[in-house]
């Protein structure tokens, strides 16, 4: 029992950024006013519940968890995929994705290590396939503004991307979202 391999979800983030950059260019060419990321399931839920007029602006691109799990299943359909991450909103995302079998929080995996008396710092290093190296922008997805930057560096004309970072779904962040909803609905030019 245990894990036989690990893949960095940042590889999936690179795929997401590639696809979101293409989608952004297509949307802007057809005259859309704006596009938002789809990478955070809590953000997408907040838009659905509180700013539904902005929903059409949310990217159709799948999230990094999906793409990395898909790659793992394509290597071997019998592989069991377990996403380990800090965000509890990822649990629902994993439950809704056919390529993801399980989701553990960082806290849960830490508790498992303690229960099994595994000292991670004392474990022998394992060689990893150097072809599976994510880009810096893929690794920075979780940083505030990281998704927008990853998309920007992939655009044919990066100067066309004017990004606004909404850091958190607190009252200030929700007010910013509401303002973008008004722009999308035409209530504000």
Which sequence ranges carry the predicted segments?
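Iron-sulfur-associated redox domains of electron-transfer enzymes in respiratory
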Residues: 1-189
């Amino acid at each position: 029992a245990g894990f036989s391999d690990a893949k960095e979800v940042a590889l999936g983030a690179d795929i997401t950024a590639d696809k979101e950059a293409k989608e952004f260019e297509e949307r802007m060419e057809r005259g859309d006013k704006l596009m938002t990321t789809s990478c955070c399931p809590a953000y997408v839920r907040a838009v659905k519940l509180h700013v539904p007029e902005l929903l059409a602006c949310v990217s159709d691109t799948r999230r990094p968890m999906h793409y990395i799990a898909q790659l793992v299943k394509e290597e071997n359909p019998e592989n069991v995929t377990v996403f380990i991450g800090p965000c509890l909103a990822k649990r629902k995302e994993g439950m809704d994705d056919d390529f993801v079998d399980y989701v553990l929080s960082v806290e849960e995996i830490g508790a498992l290590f303690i229960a099994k008396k595994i000292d991670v710092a004392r474990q022998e290093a394992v060689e990893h396939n150097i072809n599976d190296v994510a880009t810096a922008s893929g690794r920075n997805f979780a940083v505030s503004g990281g998704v927008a930057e990853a998309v920007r560096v992939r655009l044919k004309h990066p100067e066309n991307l004017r990004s606004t970072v909404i850091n958190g779904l607190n009252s200030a962040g929700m007010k910013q979202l509401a303002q973008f909803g008004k722009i999308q609905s035409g209530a504000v030019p």
